[in-house]
Amino acid sequence: MARVKRGVIARARHKKILKAAKGYYGARSRVYRVAFQAVIKAGQYAYRDRRQRKRQFRQLWIARINAAARQNGLSYSKFINGLKKASVEIDRKTLADIAVFDKVAFAALVEKAKSAL
């Protein structure tokens, strides 16, 4: 059986991992073994956090809406319930934007929600 020399393939694989680990601290960017583990772990974190980002933004929007609603004398849950009863279909992202940048429009929405309760 013929001998298989893997030098080229191994070098390419190592280069690929070390390129992905560029900018990491210390041995994580220089030593293949350590860099490989760091790149794998980074991928796991990235996968997990792409999902967490959606949750965290929703939490942020809800916190902002709650704060603005309470300034207008209504809790978050009652405000959302009032909007649903008034058949106002605005998503939380837009509501949070309105709460931060257009307080007058948000106050009008709160009044609409109050009247629907």
Swiss-Prot record:
Methyltransferase found in the keyword field: no
GO BP of this protein: ribosomal large subunit assembly; translation
Signal peptide from the UniProt entry: none
Pfam families to which the protein is assigned, alphabetical: Ribosomal_L20
Database matches in InterPro entries: Ribosomal_bL20, RIBOSOMAL_L20_CS, Ribosomal_protein_bL20_C
Record-linked NCBIfam families: rplT_bact (TIGR01032)
Protein name listed in UniProt: Large ribosomal subunit protein bL20
